[in-house]
Amino acid sequence: MDDRYDPQVIEAKWQQEWAARQLDRTDTDPQKPKFYALSMFPYPSGNLHMGHVRNYTITDVIARCRRMQGYRVLHPMGWDAFGLPAENAAIERGIHPRVWTQQNIGQMRQELQRLGLSYDWEREVTTCHPDYYRWTQWLFLEFFEAGLAYQKEAAVNWDPVDQTVLANEQVDSEGRSWRSGALVERRLLKQWFLKITAYAEELLNDLEQLTGWPERVKLMQANWIGQSRGAYLEFPIVGSDEKIGVFTTRPDTVYGVTYVVLAPEHPLTLKVTTSRRRKTVEAFIASVQQESELERTAGDRPKRGVATGGKALNPFTGEEIPIWIANYVLYEYGTGAVMGVPAHDERDFQFAKAHRLPIRQVIIPPDGKASTRLRAAYTEPGKLINSGQFDGMDSTAAKVAITEYATAQGWGREHVQYRLRDWLISRQRYWGVPIPIIHCPQCGPVPVPRSELPVLLPEEVEFTGRGPSPLAKLAAWRDVPCPKCGGPAQRETDTMDTFIDSSWYYFRYADARNSEAPFDPAAIKDWLPVDQYVGGIEHAILHLLYSRFFTKVLRDRQLVHVSEPFQRLLTQGMVQGRTYKNPRTGKYVIPSRIADLNQPTDPDTGEALEVVYEKMSKSKYNGVAPGDVIQQYGADTARMFILFKAPPEKDLEWDDADVEGQFRFLNRVWRLVQTFKAKGGRLGQPLPATLTKAEKDLRRAIHTAIKEISEDIEGDYQLNTAVAELMKLSNALSSADCYTSGVYSEGIQTLLTLLAPFAPHISEELWHQLGGTDSIHRQPWPKADPTALVADEITLVIQVMGKTRGAIQVPATASQAELEEAAQHSEIGQRYLAGKTIKKIIVVPGKLVNFVLESSR
C-alpha cells in the first residue's frame, strides 16, 4: 500500500498530462448549454500574490463544477499588460517595457499552471500585443465615428523640473514629484475623452437588471453616477450678452442668491473680470492650479475665493449680484458655476461669512419665523419668505412652481444632472495603446485608416522620465502625411488609459484568434454575457462601469447583442496576514525578528506589539508567497485552505495552522483510498439488494454530501461549507467498515468526484489508482438520490415540563400515538414520569415529545 501522499510529484504529473491531452480546451458542442466563467485578468507584475490565488481558485471551482454538470465552459486567462510600472522599469533598469512585461507574463503563467487552474490557454490574450491592441484602436475609431471620442483641455500633474506629465500615483502626499522632488503644478493640456455621460441615465437605470450583482457594488456605481434632479438657471452678465448657467437642486432658494461663483478655469472668468481686479484674479488662478482636485473639494479645507469685479443679474429679484471665483468650484463638474445661497447652504454660508457677502433668508421652518441673525444655514425644507409671488408656499411645491416660472420666462428649465464626468483617456506615456488619430493643420484630427491599423509602438525609444513622452520626441514615428489631404501632419502622441484595454477583453476571449475583426458577432451571441465574473471590490466602480459603458456603445454600433456584460458578479474578500506593529511609532516589525510570537515585543525597544490582520503587503511584512506554500504543501492544499477558511465574499485571515489542517485532510483522503484498495474495494461495485443499517447510514451521508455541496455551488458559492461537507463525508467513510460493499464503493467514487473541482490533482491521481477511465474531470456531477436521504429512524427528543431529559431512536414513519407511547415507555420516560400524573402531551412530529405534568400540592 502506497501510504505516502507526495503532492509535488502528483501535481507535476497531472499538469503535464492535462496539457498533453488539452483537457481544458473549450468545448464547443452546441448541444450543451454554455457557461462563461471569468476572473478579472491580472497586471503582469511578475509574481502572483494570495489575492490572485483566491480569485482564480474560486472561479476555477465554478468552471470545473459546471463542466461536470454538462455545460460547455469558456474559462480563459490573459494579461492586462500595458501600464506605468513597465515604463518605470525601463527608466530605472534600462530594460524595454515589452521585454520586462513578457518576462513577467512567462513567470506568472508558470505560477498559474502550478495551481492546476483549468484555463484554455489557446484563448490567452495579452493587451500589449499588436494582435490585441489593433482592435482596441479599431474600437476607438467606432467611438470617434459615433461622436463619443473628442478632445478638450483638462488639467494634468506637471513636474516643472523634469518638464513632464505625472500620473496621480507619481505625486506624493505633499504634492511633490516622486523623481525630482519638485512641487507639482496643475497644467491644462488638450486631451482625449470618451463621452460616458451620454450613457449616464442608462448606466444608472440598468443597475436594476443586475440581480446577480452584490447590492453594495450597485450602490457604489449609482453614487458614482450621481443623479440629481433640479433646475438649470441662467444669470445674465451685466454689460454683456452672455449668461452664467448653473444647476441647482434647490430652485426654491433662488430669491436668496446674493452672489454667483465661477470655477477659476471657467471660460467666462477672465471675460467678467474688471481691469482693476485682473492681477488679483490671475494670481488666484495660478495658486489654484497648484492644488489637486481633492484639496480643492475637501470639506475641511478653507474655501478660498476672490471677487472678479463683474456683476450678474438675478432675474428673479432684478438685483445685480457680484461674480466671484473660488477654489471649491470645479469646471469639470456640472456647469462650472454655482449660485451662492448663504442662508440655505452651509458651504455658501461659510464663504459669505468669510468674505462679508449678503445673507438673505428665503425659507423658514414650517412652523417658525425668520431669524434676525442666522448662526448657521437653514438647509431643511420649509416655507418661502422674501420670494415675491411664491411667498408662503412650502419649499417642495415651490421647487416645481419656480422651475415652471423660469421656463416660461426663458430663464431656465427642469434639468437632470449627473456627478459622472466624461472619461479622460489620454496618457502622456509610451507603454499604452497609441491613439489612432493624425493631427493635420488643414483637416484637424483625422482617424488613421482602418487598413493601416495597428499603429505600432516604435521599438527604438529612449526612456529618461524627463521632458515630453517618448512618442512625442520621436520625429520619425510622429511626423506623417495626413491621410485626408496628404499634407504634413503629426500622429497623436498620447496613449490610451489602460482601463480601455480591460473594458472589452471579455469579448475577445470569445473569438481570441480572429485576425479579421475584434470578434465575430456569432461568437459573442454564443458566449456572452459572462455568466460568472469574479474579482476584487476595488474594481466596483471604474473597471465595471467602463465595461458596462463599452458594452452599451458596441451594442449601439451593432457589434454585440448584449446590453450588460456580466450576469453575475462575485467580489471576493481580501487575503489578510498577521502584522506586528508598534502602536507608539506605527512601525511594522518583521516576524523573524520577534523572539516570541505569542507574546510579541519590539526587538529594539522592548515595547509590546499590536497584533492585527491586515491586507498582505511587503511594507507590513505579512505577505505569503504562493510558490512557497505550493512547494511545501502542494497546490491542492493551497486551494483547499483558500476555499475553506472563509466565505468567498468575506476577508480571509491567513493561518499556517489551518493550511496544515487542510494538508492533513488530503492525507486522510489519500490513506482512505489506499485502505479501500488494500481491502479489495473497487469502483463500480453494484449496490446490495438489501442494505444493512450501517450501509443505509453511510449512503445517507453520501447523498447528503451531494445535496449540500450542489446547493452550495448553485447558490451563493458558499465553497467553505462545501469543503466542510467533504470533510464530513470523509469522516463517515473512515468510520464505516464495509469496504467491499457497493455502498462504500459509491462513497469513495462520490468523495473523489465532489473533491475534484476543489483539489483536482489528488482526485485525478486516486481516481486512476482505482482504475477510473478518462479523466475524473470529465465524469458527470453526482445527483442526490431522494430515497437515500430518507432515514429509517429519527432522533426523538424527550422533554418533561419543557426541559430536555434525553433522546431515543424511533421509526421515521411512527404515528403521533406511537411517538407518545415510545417516549412514555422508554427508559428516560419511566425515570422522569414514574409516580407523576400526566396532564398533557405535546408532540412536534419528527422532533420531540413534551410531557406536561399535574402540579403536586
UniProtKB/Swiss-Prot annotation:
Gene coding for it: leuS
Organism: Thermosynechococcus vestitus (strain NIES-2133 / IAM M-273 / BP-1)
GO molecular function: aminoacyl-tRNA deacylase activity; ATP binding; leucine-tRNA ligase activity
A GO biological process held by the record: leucyl-tRNA aminoacylation
Protein name: Leucine--tRNA ligase
Family according to the record: Belongs to the class-I aminoacyl-tRNA synthetase family.
Reaction(s) this enzyme catalyzes, per UniProt: tRNA(Leu) + L-leucine + ATP = L-leucyl-tRNA(Leu) + AMP + diphosphate
Keyword entries, A-Z: Aminoacyl-tRNA synthetase, ATP-binding, Cytoplasm, Ligase, Nucleotide-binding, Protein biosynthesis
InterPro entries from the UniProt entry: aa-tRNA-synth_I_CS, aa-tRNA-synth_Ia, Leu-tRNA-ligase, Leu_tRNA-synth_edit, M/V/L/I-tRNA-synth_anticd-bd, Methionyl/Leucyl_tRNA_Synth, Rossmann-like_a/b/a_fold, tRNAsynth_Ia_anticodon-bd
Compartments it resides in: Cytoplasm
Family matches, as HAMAP family: Leu_tRNA_synth_B (MF_00049_B)
Residue numbers covered by motif 'KMSKS' region: 615-619
PANTHER family: LEUCINE--TRNA LIGASE, MITOCHONDRIAL, LEUCYL-TRNA SYNTHETASE
